[in-house]
């Protein structure tokens, strides 16, 4: 179910304050966050946000196309290593 329009998009307060401070000083540095649930706002464009995937922080450079999506969409948590191969040919 989608979020109610009357509530508006969600972003963690600590993340928003960090980005606003960087925008005031015109600095571009990596911001570490564990908040995968935060929505990407237009203020984030041009910044690199390191999103935690459960093991490490994945650097995500924010572009215009990402606005409105969640940070967690760009840091996958699971690695797919493929299905087990069919060893019938090697058993002969």
Curated annotation (Swiss-Prot):
Source organism superkingdom: Bacteria
Keyword presence, Ribosomal protein: yes
UniProt-listed Pfam families: Ribosomal_S19
Keyword Transferase assigned: no
Subunit structure, interactors included: Part of the 30S ribosomal subunit.
Protein family according to the UniProt entry: Belongs to the universal ribosomal protein uS19 family.
An individual GO BP term: ribosomal small subunit assembly
GO annotations of cellular component type: cytoplasm; small ribosomal subunit
Listed Gene3D superfamilies: 30s Ribosomal Protein S19, Chain A
Name of the protein in question: Small ribosomal subunit protein uS19
A molecular function GO annotation: structural constituent of ribosome
Keywords: Ribonucleoprotein, Ribosomal protein, RNA-binding, rRNA-binding
Record function comment: Protein S19 forms a complex with S13 that binds strongly to the 16S ribosomal RNA.
